[in-house]
Regions:
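Residues within the helices of the helix-turn-helix
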Residues: 10-11, 37
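Anionic, Ser/Thr-rich low-complexity intrinsically disordered regions
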Residues: 10, 47-51
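Major-groove DNA-recognition helix of helix-turn-helix-type DNA-binding domains
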Residues: 16-44, 54, 60-67
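Short aromatic/basic micro-patch
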Residues: 7-8, 44
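A detector for short, charged/polar N-terminal pre-domain segments
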Residues: 1-5, 63
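Short amphipathic alpha-helical segments, especially helix-boundary/capping motifs
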Residues: 1, 10, 25-28
Length: 67
């Protein structure tokens, strides 16, 4: 049972990503953004999905030896 995924609330995701709660709600309505689960009336996000979403926006700087 130790390998169960950690789930975050909408507020926790908002604080972690700096994406507003209204924006998260709009993304769900538009079926875009971070994958989520609806448990009755509660919305939960898997931590792994949130981290993957954040990583997908990562831009690696170009390394160049020419000046």
């Amino acid at each position: 049972m130790q390998n169960l995924p950690k789930y975050l609330t909408e507020r926790e995701v908002s604080e972690l990503t700096r994406i507003g709660m209204k924006t998260l709600q709009q993304h769900r309505w538009l079926k875009k953004g971070i994958a989520y689960s609806r448990l009755d009336r509660s919305i939960r996000y898997r931590l792994d999905d949130v981290l993957a979403f954040m990583e997908s926006g990562r831009i690696e700087p170009e390394t160049s030896n020419t000046h």
